[in-house]
C-alpha cells in the first residue's frame, strides 16, 4: 500500500509558514522555533513533506497489520511519507507497531521531532493506515480534528459502491420480470390444455336422483314395529308382569318414572345384584304402599297389578335357614310414611292387627330400578355426605346417624347394618368401619351398598357382643312391640 504522489497536508504547510513569523506573536515556544530545521539549518536540496520529490524503495508499505510492524518497518513507513530524516530515530528508540499506533505529540517531541507540522504529518499518516486496515482506535489514541467531519461527505469510493449496488438491483429485477412472464405463459398453456378434460369430466357426471313425494322413505314404515315377546316375558304375563313397548309395569301405577323407557328392567336383561332403590321415587312409593296397606289390611294378592307375582330371591334377602328367627318382617306404617321411604319389603303382620294370627307370609321384595350411584373413590362420601360421620367412624356411630337421617325414631340397637356387594351380603360388626370398607369394595368394582335390617332384640349389650354379630346373638327368639321399617340406604 502506498500513498499517491502529491498529497498535500494543509496542517503542516500552515505550521511551517506560521513558524517564519515573529516569535513574539507565535504561540510556539522560542526554543522550539530555534531548534526547528527550517530556521536553524541552512537551505538544503532535500524535499519537503509537500513535494515528495524523492522516492525510494521504502515507498511500499508493509503488507502486515500496523500493530505487528517491527522497528525497521516503522522506519520505512516514516521514510515513505517523506520524513526520511526521522527514520533512524524510530530505529534507535525501537518504535514497533504497537507503539506506533499509540504515539502522541509529546512522544514525538521527546524523540527529537520538534516541528509541529512534521508531528502532525506522522500522526495523521498513522491514523489513515489504522482506518484503512480497520484497526480499532482507542480512546487515548490520536484522532485528527478533521476526521470528525469526514463521514459526512460522500467520497468517490462511496459513489462507486452505490452505483454498483444499483446496477445489481436492476439486473435482479430484470431476471424477476423474465421469470414472471415465463410463469404466466406456462399457466395460460396449462389452462388451455385442462379445459377440454374438465368439460369431459363435467359432462360425464350423472345428476343425483330426485325424491318424489318422500317415496324413498316409504319402506321404513313397514319395518318399525314393537319387538316380538320373548318366552320369558310371555311366561310371566299370566302372573301380572309383562313387557310392553317402551314401558315397564311397576307397583305404583302411572308415575313419571314408570313409563320412561330408560328405566326398563326385567329379570333376563339385568342381574338382581344390581337392583337397588331409586332415591328419587322411593318416598312416593313408600307413601302409596303404606296407605294401601292401611286401607285394605290384607296382603297383596298375586294378581294385583301393583306388585309382581314372581318371588325371585335377592342378594339382600336372608337365607332360607334363618327364616323369621333373626330378621323381622318389614312393613310400612301409615303413621310414619317418611321412614318407610327406604324399605323394599311389605307384609301384613303389622299392617293389620289380626294378620299375625292368620298365617305368616314370606316377605316379598319389590323390583326397583337401579339408581345412578356415584362411582370412584368418593362414592361413600356421596352416600353419607349428610350423615355427619367420618371415614374412621365405627359402625355404632354410623348406625345412629343413618337412622336419624331417615327419621327412624327407634333405638339404634334394634337395627343392624349390612353391606351388600355382588351376590353376597355381610352384617357389619359394631367396631368395623363401614365407610372404609365401602371404599375398598368400590375400588375393586364390586358396587357395594348398605342396607338397614331390624333385629328382634330390644337392647344390645355392646360389651358382650362379639364383633360382626351386629346384635344378632342376643336377638334369637326375642320379641318387641316396636317395629320400624328397614331397607336399603
UniProtKB/Swiss-Prot annotation:
The record's note on its domains: The sterile alpha-motif (SAM), but not the Ras-association domain, is important for its interaction with MCK1 and responses to cell wall and oxidative stresses.
Free-text function comment from the UniProt entry: Mitogen-activated protein kinase adapter protein; part of the MST11-MST7-PMK1 MAP kinase (MAPK) cascade that is essential for appressorium formation, penetration and invasive growth. Binds to the MAPKKK MST11 and the MAPKK MST7 to maintain the stability of the MST11-MST7 complex for the phosphorylation of the MAPK PMK1. Is also involved in the MPS1 and OSM1 MAPK pathways, and especially plays a role in the activation of MPS1 in response to cell wall stress. Its function differs in the 3 MAPK pathways.
Sequence ranges assigned to domain Ras-associating in this UniProt record: 377-457
Organism: Pyricularia oryzae (strain 70-15 / ATCC MYA-4617 / FGSC 8958)
Coiled-coil zones: none
Pfam families: RA, SAM_2
Source organism superkingdom: Eukaryota
GO biological process: signal transduction
Disordered: annotated span: 1-56, 207-285, 309-379
Protein name per Swiss-Prot or TrEMBL: Mitogen-activated protein kinase adapter protein MST50
